[in-house]
Amino acid sequence: MKVSLNVTNYSWPDGPTQLASRLISLAAAAEDGGLDTIWVNDHLLQADPGAGPGERDMLEAYDTLSFLAGTTTRIGLGAMVSAISYRAPALLIKAVTTLDVLSGGRAWLGVGAGYPGEAERLALPLPPTGQRFDLLADTLALARHMWTGQPGPFTGKRLTVPDPQGVPGPVRRGGVPVLVGGAGERRTLRLVAEYADACNLFDIPDEGVTLRHKLDVLREHCDDVGRDYAAIEKTVSTRLGAEETADQFAGRCARLAGWGLSHAVVITPGPWTARRLATLTSAARLVADA
């Protein structure tokens, strides 16, 4: 199983002036420790319901990922996940393509339909749910159109692009790998089957009942659209407990793998600390050796 970290909280105790050095140290330790990808939340406001009143620092996702690209050489880089209506589709595709080019082919495009709270507070665009899913499908189709060099205009259900050029293209042939976040059975998992290289589900504490069910639904969608289910990376967002040991977390990864997951994307209460990151990298080595 692959193991990655997700940065959801930037409120380290030494404040914003040290954020750059904190991120450099975090990225170096993650890369040296063998983690697969650094994910960052694509939020403008703190979205962790467990964050304290003083933990409000949040950085823009693609600026942060571009900064991390310049301080690392191997580890993957992605947003977990971008609300589809916050950026114009062509701009989002250009941003992730630029990240892929400048990182030497290490970017992920992580996208989802978005949710109301943050958009309402910051007056961000948030069309009705059905329109957002249409826009998500159009954006994924547009990315494929641009990354494969298809000629001519693009016309989707909600989106028309007269001249969808994307030069330079991504480093990897076929484009940047796509992760669609969310577990909605009718539309989200259908879009995974149609367009994505990975899904992202949530680690519900019910002994795998929900996760196995969601994967069964994804398999049905794959069968319906003629997609190879095995070709989709099954990621799961899960939390490393404050006192959890490497052995304990590796055991949880083994259970997740037994339920059909292949990639653990790990968050932690509060900002990442050196101790918690060391626990995670130790667990990643145990999982790799299993």
Give the label of every model feature segment:
Residues 3-7, 38-40, 76-79, 107-111, ...:
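Hydrophobic faces of well-ordered beta-strands that scaffold small-molecule active sites
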Residues 30, 34, 42, 68, ...:
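Conserved, mostly hydrophobic/aromatic
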